[in-house]
Amino acid sequence: FMPVYHYLRLHLSDARADGALSGLLETLRLQDKLARPLTQLSCGEWQRVRLAAAFAQIDPALNPQGRVLLLDEPMTGLDVAQQNAVHNLIVGLRRAGVCVIASSHDLNHTLRHADSVWLMAQGRVVAQGAAASILTPERLSDLYAIPFRQLELDGQPLLTIQP
């Protein structure tokens, strides 16, 4: 069975890859997993390995032409510390000029951090625009057929389901 390190190197051909991977492995706390077979990883560990491979492929130092990163539910299976680490990596890529497109079911994270949103239902875009104008209690209540409300906590919007 393939170990984590070999899986990550499959996605990188540049000789500088080890340097780029080193920071990612530290950020995602994967250094001690490198020799472990992929089949022995937990869901969260496997998610972090796949994210490390994706982030390494788009790393501006290794791929100056890379401009778009597409992530499908990147926070799935991650604890809050790892979610924060992934969020910080995404912010770093955005600052480097990479467009990051991510699917998410976490409405509050999306509301606080997304520049723009495509709200989908049954595989179709039903609304698009700035997160604050799309992720409204009215629109979400209509879409999910449950009552939403928006609160403010420490100056940040918080979507909740009404009791």
Where are each of the predicted segments found?
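Catalytic Walker B motif of ABC-type/P-loop ATPase nucleotide-binding domains
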Residues: 64, 69-73
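Conserved ABC ATPase "signature" region
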Residues: 18-33
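A short, surface-exposed alpha-helical micro-motif characterized by mixed small hydrophobic
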Residues: 110-112
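Conserved ABC ATPase signature
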Residues: 37-41
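H-loop/switch region of ABC-family ATPase nucleotide-binding domains
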Residues: 104-105
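ABC ATPase nucleotide-binding domains
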Residues: 137, 141-163
